[in-house]
């Protein structure tokens, strides 16, 4: 028994998991939000729906978004007209693009993360790949392993259909892997596309317009490991704790269903109110061990699900106007990229902290929170510790 305890102890790291590198990628096709209503209704042959187009234009104007990136091209939509219909039977066409583009975009982000990390990709021991697009067997984790040229013995985990909160999920999983497998280095990749969800408008499904106004494509990758070797590695953030919570009375608030028509997403109007009404519970539980209850004393990495969610979080917690600056910037420049979005915010936080001459990667603060929100309603809460920025 003693030898088993020794073996178990030998497998565990000495310290907490750390984020060692971040990389991001977006498709080349850029759509300006101001022009998108005209483009969307033209491509879906819905210009006769003038009242619906006015509603959509209002949604876009209030979205906080300046531009978005999507893998869909005008040529693809013209060649696959069923995709542009509201409920056209188009799953095959969507799958054909998603199973290729999901790992390809993820690879772009992973290459950047590994380059920043500075170590050989053969040192990657685990791979977590997350996406709500292109369900296939073998999955995007397998495809990325081949494209990137990872060791064939890399331990893979594929996380499908979790939605917008999963940026926090993959960090929680990576933390557990890194801290319980001494010397491991975990490559985390979130790659999300609108290929499954893009569809034309319908007067009978106004809630679908919200997703069409907000969602975008993007991939983010991280390298996570415990006990970084300071001679060759540098921590960006430490993952102090990670938890998940289902919010009460939120059944059916956000749902997604795979059908012959693709992935249909349904959003209830009270989603922002449900999040804001319950957000203090996971916050209090996460920061109670640290004795922190002033939410303006920490830095914020919040999934920018939409402007209403961010506004209500600010109001509920009494956050200063600049607290969600990183989230609002990512929402403006990229839109809602589902699970990868909060990792873009993390990258923006460290980059902006450096550019602004702050003393830490958390805007000069030591402690921070990463929030993922999504179907369930589910909240992922990750407590972060920043690191000093060397002058």
Curated annotation (Swiss-Prot):
> What biological process terms from GO does the record include?
flavonoid biosynthetic process; polyketide biosynthetic process
Q: Which PANTHER family match?
A: CHALCONE SYNTHASE, HYDROXYMETHYLGLUTARYL-COA SYNTHASE
Keyword flag Chaperone = no
Protein name per Swiss-Prot or TrEMBL: Probable acridone synthase 4
**Does the record bear Transferase in its keywords?**
yes
Q: Which residue stretches, if any, does this entry annotate as coiled coil?
A: none
Q: What class of enzyme is it?
A: transferase
Look up the EC number in the record and give it: 2.3.1.159
State the active site: 164
Q: Which GO terms describe its molecular function?
A: acridone synthase activity
Task: Tell me the keywords, alphabetical order.
Answer: Acyltransferase, Flavonoid biosynthesis, Transferase
InterPro entries given for it? Chalcone/stilbene_synt_C, Chalcone/stilbene_synt_N, Chalcone/stilbene_synthase_AS, Polyketide_synthase_type-III, Thiolase-like
What organism is this sequence from? Ruta graveolens
Q: Which reaction does it catalyse?
A: N-methylanthraniloyl-CoA + 3 malonyl-CoA + 3 H(+) = 1,3-dihydroxy-N-methylacridone + 3 CO2 + 4 CoA + H2O
Similarity annotation? Belongs to the thiolase-like superfamily. Chalcone/stilbene synthases family.
